[in-house]
Amino acid sequence: MGTELARRLLNEQDGIELTVWNRTAERAQPLVEEGAELAASPTEAVANAEVIITSLFGPDDVREVVVEPQLIPAGVTWIDTTTVSPNDAREFAAAVETYVHAPVVGTLGPAREGKLGVYVGTPDDDRRELAMTIAESWADENKLIGVESAATAAIGKLLANLAL
């Protein structure tokens, strides 16, 4: 999913400078061919970033790659699209003040078409607005929903999955 979200950013956001990292570097190569810069490590990927977007396999990966190594620089907005539980979202929001949970609802087809559902959750109105503007690249405008907490975004995502 992360590849498709990054591809939408490259195609929809004029002038974006996008740095990507993947544990399996070959998986990031198509994005490099489309204009992204490949980082050798997560630390290199976030260096000088204005916004950091993660799309990982699950909450344990979020802890390992982002939270435990304290990857997010102070003041930098972190938008995480990983599917996590409400308790995980609360944990990440407590660990990183700039955390915005923005899980996506849908499969690769809607992702390629920019028609995903997205819940964007944070109590910070400015960060929520920023994240929603970015998520417009991969979201269906009628399914882009801002909520006031990371946990509420996680709940919305889980309920949407039940309806599928």
Model-derived features: positions:
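Short, hinge-like loop/turn segments at secondary-structure boundaries
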Residues: G35-A39, S55, I72, L116-G121, ...
